[in-house]
Amino acid sequence: MKIKKSVVCTLAAVAGFIVSAKAEFMVGYGREDVTPPLGTHLSGYFHERLADGILDPLDAIAVAFSDGTNRAVVMSLDIISLRGYFDLYREGVAAATGLDPQAVFIACTHTHTGPLVGSCRYGKKLDSFERASNYEKWLLDQLASAAKIALNDLAPAKLGIARGEAKGISFIRRYRMKDGSCRTNPGVGNPDIVAPIGEADEQVQLVRVDRTGKPSIAIVNFQCHPDTIGGNKISADWPRVVRETVESVLDDVKCVFVNGPQGDSNHICTDPAKRSPYLTRQTVYKHMGRKIGGVAVGLWDECRPVDVGKVGYSIAKVKVKSNRGRPEQLPEAERIVALHRSGQFAKIPGDTGMQKTTACAEARRILQLANGPDYFDFPLSTVTIGEALAFVGIPGEPFTGYGISMKKRSPFTMTVSACLVNGNFGYLPTDEAFKETGYETQGSLFVEGLEKAIVEGHLEQLERLFKNK
């Protein structure tokens, strides 16, 4: 039987979504160390910190997926953010591996005891590594190496999924106060607290990958700020403990952790009656990691099989309005930033440290957007496997509401939402949160309408990939 030329052309045109009948679904795993040298500037706070020790190493972990025609790699990186270098790292990994740049999904765990990378303002892009540090250049080599290891490790695989909960370790950090205001981190036992504003997402999602002739892979998803340790020592914080817990209990299993929307959550329980009197700054990160990892271990044997299928991927852009200040606000913003840079934190407006930090964040935002833009092109990254699994990447720190909404509305059997993927536009509050004041909203580059644009944009992307499965 002859096949018409037009049919052949049509098949070729959609080859990105076609899997040969003989093709096998395959998954690979790669890991590289990305620990910086001592003396490195650490990121996460509004003051300078130089690394003077190492509590535990930092990793770049890659999971590669192939359907025989299409390949994609999902990466988890123990770094707070790649700031302006995200595109350069993504394109560099693609060039080193032969992947489509849109098939490279780089997610940062957001540890606050890791190196400062791509130092520039939120939403800015750096065009080259010309001014990069030796570490920043070496980091590209390590990311590319982890991806190549994963692609070279591809083996026939089957998927299973399960969900559970890790309760009592993640808390909304924005609170309604008795005077009607909204405050971030108001302090443990503050008598003026009325209630948290928002809903903590305590769900643990597990993707079990069983491979022929090679170690299985556990992909664990939870959502909370990794900011429990502080100080000047390098650490991946509790996400590393999640991985260590899973790998130490389950036989012949490699683990990767993906942090979800965490912009308004952290580990601090402000209610003294509900706080454990035995947890300290030195132990809370281990407790969190063991609890999340323990839930994943408990779910391992309960994972239900799901059908695998075509590997899809996409980076789509949505246009979102920026939060520009008024011209009359510029002089005060310049004064506040100058005070902060000169170390005169006490002179910055505000009665508490958090209020002063909020003033700094707002001033920086006003100065950054003084000359525009009025709108940002906001990249949304997605990797999908058949009808079973979707990885949704948001380039910033979305509030937990984003993940809760997308998990409920996604057409895929399991949707893993990830923060700080292929970009960093700072805090991404929900539309409801934009009606409040506070650290995250006053410093955000955006205004109300952001959540709708991102969630609806991602859902359109998911529906498109789902139909082309």
Predicted regions and their residues:
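Bacterial N-terminal signal peptides that target proteins for export
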Residues: 1-10
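Sec/Tat signal peptide C-region and signal peptidase I cleavage site
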Residues: 17-23
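Anionic-ligand-binding alpha/beta catalytic cores of soluble enzymes and soluble regulatory domains
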Residues: 292
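Bacterial N-terminal signal peptides
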Residues: 9-17
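Conserved beta-alpha junction segments in alpha/beta enzyme cores
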Residues: 23-287, 300, 307-469
